[in-house]
């Protein structure tokens, strides 16, 4: 059994989630404490600049200009996150077997076999004095896979604790939304479904100065533009069968016409819910249960809109099952780090489109 810490900095650019689990790489035997280290406004601004610059990258190891500055900021933020986490919870470094370090995705173009996560694992391992596993996605993309989503193996481990007969979907609504379809047998299908919070968060920042729509309050006051949503759902991505994946900026060109902020928030919230529901006809069977994690799970308006789209199947928050809403992806990368140490698969043909089940990750020691 291993004690693993996972860290995740997602496409929402909000901060670093930290989580400890006990696992053998197959089962999760215990959930440990979780933590969160928000990015400062300066760090978040630097990451947004890096995202804009990264569209010009052609090599995954290139770190020109602001991207190199952002990599240093990401590394230091993760070092601070794990050091504070250990101190706050009275955990000794020597009791940690592995730290799973995802880094910050700034570019994801699997069609070009290119995925770029910034973060210096060597510097991090030296700073925290614990072995670090990183570069989880590279082997999958190099082999022709989508390189995402990577959390399905962890979703399946969690689902082992559920008494279920029919298929379920576990949804993570982060900057990008993704689903994992798990049936009563061994079928595991996963894919990105479309924008999660990214378009909405960007809209909120641009129109209100707020980083996100807390509790869906603004969207609740507005009216969704059904015509705009129907047009947006004509994007060819939505007709593709799984597996498929997205870059955070793939839908950035979708422009809302001028409208009151409340209507814009309502439209983008409804679009996220509708995009998730569009996966149902592409699955072997309609899911009988939906379990939602990620920042979107804290938006009751988004959940209500999703319920309307997938009825009569129930939609519930992950924390109703004792799972973590905010730290699930961090837990997943601790779990994946343990799997990587044992050479177990991290991705599968039906989750990323990789030709064969693939292990991955690179270990850096202090």
From Swiss-Prot:
EC code: 2.7.1.170
Any Pfam family the entry gives: AnmK
Keywords, in A-Z order: ATP-binding, Carbohydrate metabolism, Kinase, Nucleotide-binding, Transferase
Domain of life: Bacteria
GO MF annotation, one: ATP binding
Reactions accelerated catalytically: 1,6-anhydro-N-acetyl-beta-muramate + ATP + H2O = N-acetyl-D-muramate 6-phosphate + ADP + H(+)
Annotated family: Belongs to the anhydro-N-acetylmuramic acid kinase family.
Protein name: Anhydro-N-acetylmuramic acid kinase
């Amino acid at each position: 059994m291993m004690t693993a810490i996972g860290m995740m900095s997602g496409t929402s650019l909000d901060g670093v989630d930290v989580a400890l689990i006990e696992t053998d790489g197959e089962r999760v035997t215990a959930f440990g404490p979780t933590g969160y280290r928000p990015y400062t406004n300066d760090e978040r601004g630097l990451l947004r600049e890096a995202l804009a610059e990264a569209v010009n990258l052609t090599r995954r190891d290139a770190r020109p200009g602001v991207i190199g500055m952002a990599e240093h900021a990401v590394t230091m933020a993760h070092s601070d996150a794990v050091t504070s986490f250990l101190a706050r919870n009275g955990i000794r470094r020597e009791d940690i077997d592995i730290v799973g370090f995802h880094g910050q995705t700034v570019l994801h173009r699997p069609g070009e076999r290119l995925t770029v996560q910034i973060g210096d694992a060597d510097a991090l391992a030296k700073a925290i004095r614990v072995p670090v596993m990183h570069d989880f996605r590279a082997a999958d993309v190099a082999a022709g896979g989508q390189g995402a989503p990577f959390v399905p193996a962890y979703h399946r481990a969690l689902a082992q604790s559920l008494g279920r007969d029919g298929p379920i979907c576990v949804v993570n609504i982060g900057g990008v939304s993704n689903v994992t379809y798990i049936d009563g047998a061994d079928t595991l299908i996963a894919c990105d479904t479309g924008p999660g919070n990214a378009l909405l968060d960007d809209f909120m920042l641009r129109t209100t100065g707020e980083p996100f729509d807390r509790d869906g309050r603004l969207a609740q006051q507005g009216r969704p533009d059904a015509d705009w949503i129907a047009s947006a759902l004509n994007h060819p991505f939505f007709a593709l069968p799984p597996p498929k994946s997205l870059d955070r900026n793939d839908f950035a060109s979708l422009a809302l016409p001028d409208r009151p902020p409340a209507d814009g928030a309502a439209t983008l919230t409804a679009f996220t819910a509708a995009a998730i529901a569009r996966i149902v006809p592409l699955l072997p069977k309609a899911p009988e249960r939906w379990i939602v994690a990620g920042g979107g799970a804290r938006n009751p308006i988004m959940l209500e809109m999703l319920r309307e789209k997938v009825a009569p199947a129930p939609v519930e928050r992950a924390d109703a099952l004792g799972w973590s809403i905010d730290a699930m992806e961090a837990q997943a990368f601790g779990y994946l780090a343990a799997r990587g140490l044992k050479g177990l698969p991290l991705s599968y043909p039906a989750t990323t489109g990789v030709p064969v089940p693939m292990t991955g990750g690179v270990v850096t020691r202090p």
